Amino acid sequence: MTIFGICDTITRNEKEVFVLSYKTKNIIVYIAVVIFSILFCYFGNKYTMANYKLLNNQGVDATHPGVITEITNEQDYTYQNGLGGSKISFKCTLKDTGEEIEGTQVVDDYDPVPYRKVTKGDKILLDYDDTNGWQFTEYIRTDALLVLGAIFLIALLFFGRTKGLNTIISLGFTCIAIFAVFIPAVISGQNIYLWSVGICAYTIIMTLLIVNGPNTKTLTSCIGCFGGVVLAGVLTFFMTKILALTGVVDESSYSLTTVNPDHPIDLLAIIFAAIIIGAMGAVMDVAMSLSSSLHELKLKVMSISPKELFKSGMVIGRDMMGTMANTLVLAYIGSSLTVTVLIVIYNSSMTELLNKERIVVEILQALVGSIGILFTIPFTCFVCAMLYRNLKPYDNNVEFDEYAYCQQLAEEKEAREARALAKKQAKEEEARAIKEGKEEANKF
């Protein structure tokens, strides 16, 4: 009987039991991870907020959002040197109180890049002081960002469907963990090294379990990702010592030292956290891509040996090396392009430029992240080769592989029949031996 005949006749109910079992396990683990994530973020926030301190602007009211309802006046002025500007008066409705107020915006030529003049219908932020009254401070830009974010979420749901929804949930927990747990831990002066490692571990496990469920593919991805992140962390820790870094990369670094004098923020630990958190995303991508590819290969070719599976993984990994390393390097360059250009302009010596701490940190981020990716590839391939040796076709509880499942059932059925036949033959041999023994005894 063919393997498809087995699935169609003998083991159809067995297949349904396997599928139901893995779906049930997936749901239980999914709910457990979500509950744990909620508890982790809640109690983590409570703990890290114990010594949380912020520098508040004393004597200044909070910023208020508003909508301009009318432009009442625009007055131009000119300085003796020929430069000038405009003072624009307007009426505005505050969103939080509904109060109708009058405010002003000053657009001055001395500003390097002057703001666009306000118009009716603009959504803005205003501050109030006793001397100048209500003053324009900034345009509200979050509305447009929310629209773009909504498009991103809709695209995730449209293209990813269930996995897209799981991606959104895992991304939400990741952002909450960073902004509600890790950032308060940094500000309150706690051990940034431990918290950054803990957040990375939580993010890796939570993301992979929510997106892929509890299976061998998730396990290999987690192990491979941990390997790459640990290597990146160890390299960063020792390189910050070897390079004699201080952690002061720009003016904002000095500001961090004044936030919590009782529990000073470790600037070197900030660099450590920035590097491993930045590298974690790329390393996780590589580990998951390799694990998924080799998992699919194993399901399609059940007879492939661990050695051949490792070789196939390395072939796939080599194709990923260049693009992922470029992605990481270009991401770091793009995120600090303005500062990099400014530093280049004011430093004529290439030697001095390459030894600026800000540039050194950017190079360190790119190199450590790339090394982490390179190490992740063979490490993940090795883990997959070891753990996929006894892989079951129904181990992947997200997408059931019909052909591989039937092939596995056929092999299991043949093994059961062989064991049953051997057992039957053994019993027959034993019965024959007993019968012959009795016949011999009767002769005497």
Role assignments for model-derived ranges:
Residues K25-I31, T216-V229, M321-T327:
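Alpha-helical transmembrane segments and their helix-start/interface "positive-inside/aromatic belt" motifs
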Residues G59-S86:
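Structural detector for short beta-strands of small beta-barrel domains
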Residues F36, F40, I178, T203, ...:
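Alpha-helical transmembrane segments of multipass membrane proteins
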Residues I3-D61:
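Hydrophobic secretory-pathway targeting helix
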Residues D319-G322, A331-I333, L337-K423, K427, ...:
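Hydrophobic alpha-helical transmembrane segments of membrane transport and translocation systems
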Residues A150-I154, T162-T257, L267-G278:
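Transmembrane alpha-helical segments that form the functional core of multipass membrane systems
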Residues F237-V361, V368:
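Generic detector of multi-pass transmembrane helix bundles and their immediately adjacent loops
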Residues D109-A144:
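Extended, hydrophilic extramembrane loops/domains of integral membrane proteins
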